[in-house]
Amino acid sequence: MPEITTKPRTKVKPQTERPKLYKVILINDDFTPREFVVTVLKGEFKLSEDQAHRIMITAHRRGVCVVAVFTKDVAETKATRATDAGKAKGYPLLFTTEPEE
């Protein structure tokens, strides 16, 4: 009679990695009106008036400010849409993204 071997069953949960997060960064410029920057921050990033104003002032004083952190696709989409809002009005408003450490 042939010998039957069985393998023990092991349950292994597949490990899913968390998606990398990216920072959306506001770059200060000397031409875009502050009120417009606040409006874009409120509209695209759903910030309160106070939050948007603080981010705008921080970027004005330091040259840059992290607006928010998202997954890569969301961060790039929001940065592009916010930058495009400035371009549509003729302003050099610029948002960039970079990986969060």
UniProtKB/Swiss-Prot annotation:
Record's function text: Involved in the modulation of the specificity of the ClpAP-mediated ATP-dependent protein degradation.
Secretion signal, residue range per the UniProt entry: none
Classification via InterPro entries: ClpS, ClpS_core, Ribosomal_bL12_C/ClpS-like
Gene of this entry: clpS2
Assigned protein family: Belongs to the ClpS family.
Protein name: ATP-dependent Clp protease adapter protein ClpS 2
Source organism: Mesorhizobium japonicum (strain LMG 29417 / CECT 9101 / MAFF 303099)
GO BP annotation list: protein catabolic process; proteolysis
Subunit comment: Binds to the N-terminal domain of the chaperone ClpA.
Matches recorded under PANTHER family: ATP-DEPENDENT CLP PROTEASE ADAPTER PROTEIN CLPS, ATP-DEPENDENT CLP PROTEASE ADAPTER PROTEIN CLPS1, CHLOROPLASTIC
HAMAP family, sorted: ClpS
Pfam families found in the cross-reference section: ClpS (PF02617)
